[in-house]
Amino acid sequence: AEIGWTDVTKLAADRRTLNLSDQLYRSIGSISANVAEGFSRGSRRDRARFYEYAHGSAREARDWYYKGRHVLDAEVVDHRLRLYSEIVRLLLTMIPEQRGASLSEPGPVYEVDPLNLFNNVPLS
């Protein structure tokens, strides 16, 4: 959630995106919280359930960033869309490992270079 703090602050400053900023902050905070809670669960089934919640929150965060594109800098939005797409991809690997099934995300395919997501992070 730390990376989104300045983004949420910028969105909250614009009356048109005040509600969007709250939804974005909740969704990005929910990702790590659900991964942490899932990791602490004793059964694979419980772990998978919390990873699925995190997956939904990551998709939601990505959607809120897209909707906030008119207020946030284009470079920031591009980075966050790629970052949350990578998180979705990682969770789609983690969930089947716990469930024993396969999942995949349908297009559009976002090009993501995971090594560059944390270098020169743009801030709003």
Question: How would you name each of these model-derived features?
Answer:
Residues 1-124:
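Short, C-terminally biased terminal segments at protein or domain edges
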